[in-house]
């Protein structure tokens, strides 16, 4: 394993010079002394332009545009990695692909930015984020796309009839709201904090940009409402059901606003689980919740069972993982939990798309593998340094950790 380290010597402190340390399999250190201007900032290792790969160029571009990274990450997981939106449309019918991409970015991107801003400005914790994620899910799937109500909606399948009561697909609804709360909202915010640790508690938009983000979400919702109304021309959920859904979504927003920031607290100290156990717990969430309804429907179980079981399992897995995360030296565990959460979605999306026989179906999975590998290596290196009692700054995504010796 090779990694680059930057250290300061007495001469470097006087002359503002930077030292690079290279670890190899043998305990051999190699030093170099290029010029350095700012002693307080992390020291990035910049490869020559000739040796930079396309991925490295993309990483550098996204590092300088954090909002763009969040906008691409947010629909990337719930839509393109899960194959809910097909990337193969880029070849089959490009105009439709970019139309759906714009709609997804406008909907998911605006939603996650607004919820992240609420989390920071209201000084709330992850419990409030999950409640806001449920409210977002009601807006998208209920008010915009009607999948919470319409029994014959494309993605609903047999869950449009199993557990359908008073005009609502209850089993489908609870699983989908958990999915949006965790994967569409919570996970992108969580990953953003790992990729950009220096921006973890900072607002990304304010003033005019904040208002524009809210208007984008409203405009996108209106567009989808009109679009779905034209597709489902023989169905209308009715004003009463839509109004009730809006009131429920508003209630979740109010609850998130009033919930104490320490409502969901992690146990202090070191992580209680290993990274492998966190990855396993994360990988359990998707099949234990969203897939449970389909299994219960196939077994002809009473719909109340998966409805209640989904809520219990999601709450149990998430709270146990969060409380076991610890408060120090937990970066590897956070990355492992994130990878575990995404892995079953990637597998599900690949299986769902395999019949298309188009090589583009593996593109989202390749990006997931490369992204996960880079993120894991980054924080694994940082953890090794931290455990070696080196004073370090939090590394940025695509940068090597920079130890500062006392």
Show which residues each predicted segment covers.
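Transmembrane alpha-helical insertion/packing segments
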Residues: 54-101, 145, 298-316, 323-335
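Alpha-helical transmembrane segments
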Residues: 63-79, 213-221, 279-288, 339-345
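Membrane-interface interhelical loops and short amphipathic "cap" helices
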Residues: 79-97, 151-170, 228-241
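Central hydrophobic cores of alpha-helical transmembrane segments in multi-pass inner-membrane proteins
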Residues: 102-117
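Membrane-interface helix-loop-helix junctions at boundaries between adjacent transmembrane segments
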Residues: 124-215
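Membrane-water interface at loop-to-transmembrane-helix junctions
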Residues: 204-215, 233-244, 265-285
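Extended, charged low-complexity segments
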Residues: 264-398, 404-406
């Amino acid at each position: 394993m090779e990694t680059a380290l930057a250290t300061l010597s007495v001469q470097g402190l006087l002359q503002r010079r930077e030292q690079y340390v290279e670890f190899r399999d043998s305990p051999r250190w190699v030093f170099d002394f290029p010029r350095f201007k700012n002693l307080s900032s992390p020291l990035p290792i910049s490869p020559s332009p000739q040796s930079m790969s396309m991925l490295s160029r993309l990483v550098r571009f996204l590092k300088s545009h954090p909002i763009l990274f969040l906008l691409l990450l947010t629909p990337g997981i719930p839509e393109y990695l899960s194959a809910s939106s097909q990337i193969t449309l880029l070849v089959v019918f490009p105009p439709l692909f970019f139309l759906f991409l714009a709609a997804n970015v406008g909907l998911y991107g605006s939603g996650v930015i607004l919820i992240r801003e609420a989390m920071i400005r209201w000084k709330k914790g992850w419990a409030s984020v999950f409640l806001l994620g449920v409210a977002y899910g009601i807006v998208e799937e209920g008010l915009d796309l009607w999948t919470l109500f319409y029994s014959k909606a494309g993605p609903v399948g047999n869950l449009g009839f199993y557990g359908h009561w008073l005009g609502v697909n209850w089993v489908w609804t609870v699983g989908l709201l958990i999915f949006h709360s965790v994967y569409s909202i919570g996970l992108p915010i969580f990953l953003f904090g790992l990729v950009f640790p220096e921006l973890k508690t900072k607002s990304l938009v304010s003033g005019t940009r904040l208002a524009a983000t809210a208007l984008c979400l409203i405009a996108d919702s209106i567009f989808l409402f009109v679009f779905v109304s034209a597709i489902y021309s023989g169905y209308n959920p009715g004003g009463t059901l839509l109004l009730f859904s809006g009131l429920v979504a508003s209630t979740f927003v109010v609850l998130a606003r009033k919930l104490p920031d320490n409502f969901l607290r992690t146990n202090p100290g070191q992580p209680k689980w290993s990274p492998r156990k966190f990855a396993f717990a994360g990988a359990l969430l998707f099949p234990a919740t969203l897939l449970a309804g389909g299994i219960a429907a196939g077994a002809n179980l009473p719909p109340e069972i998966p409805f209640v079981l989904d809520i219990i399992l999601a709450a149990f897995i998430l709270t146990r993982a969060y409380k076991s995360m610890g408060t120090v030296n937990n970066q590897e565990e956070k990355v492992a939990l994130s990878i575990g959460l995404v892995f079953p979605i990637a597998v599900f999306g690949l299986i769902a798309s395999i019949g298309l026989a188009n090589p583009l179906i593996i593109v989202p999975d390749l990006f997931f593998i490369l992204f996960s590998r880079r993120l894991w290596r980054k924080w694994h290196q940082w953890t090794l340094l931290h455990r070696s009692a080196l004073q370090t700054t939090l590394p940025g995504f695509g940068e090597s950790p920079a130890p500062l010796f006392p």
